[in-house]
Amino acid sequence: MNKYKYYLFDLDGTISESALGIRESLENAIKSMGKPLPNLDDYTLYIGPPLLDTFRNICRFNEEESARGVEIYREYYNTKGKLVNKLYDGIDRVLAELKNSGAKLAVCSSKYEKFAEEITDLLGVHDMFDAICGSTLDGSRKDKKDLIPYAVERLGGLSLIHISEPTRP
């Protein structure tokens, strides 16, 4: 029997290897705006945080440029970037074991919820989750402090564990 009944999984870097598609989408947005590319070698700087924050902090864009960068990013990501995604080896077995033990599972990602839905479907694990929880276009849910309570509400649970890639020191 599992210690926990509810599990929240991050998507990028936890369930799926998505760094290349995210980087390509980010590079495309920056180049499309005629801006110089920052050093994107450290993917932990831009995989995980909300997109608006990435454009502000990594690219040093102002508010208007950041909003436009997010639009361009999402257009590219929707047609190309999300396809450059693969399930980490063994994660499907882990999800199946948890599900078979009676646990409730949710994706809890700062990625736009529609993309999280589509990606879990593309990866063949969508049906293993009781809820797919992601950010909104209007910014009402954009980071983990907004998303975790939303996921807990969707699952109807209180005793849970959040599984994600390690945070940077």
Regions flagged by a language model, labelled:
Residues 2, 101-103, 155-159:
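Glycine-rich phosphate-binding loop signature in dinucleotide/nucleotide-binding domains
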Residues 2-45, 59:
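Active-site neighborhood of HAD-like aspartate-dependent phosphohydrolases
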Residues 22, 51, 87, 144:
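Conserved donor sugar-nucleotide recognition element shared by glycan-biosynthetic enzymes
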Residues 29-30, 50-63, 119, 151-152:
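Helix-loop "lid/cap" segments that line or gate small-molecule binding pockets
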Residues 56-93:
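Metal-dependent phosphoesterase signature
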Residues 79-107, 113-117, 145:
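Short, acidic loop-to-helix structural element flanking the phosphoryl-transfer center
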Residues 114-160:
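Substrate-recognition "cap/lid" segment bordering the active-site pocket of phosphatases
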Residues 159-169:
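Residue-level detector of conserved catalytic or cofactor/ligand-binding positions
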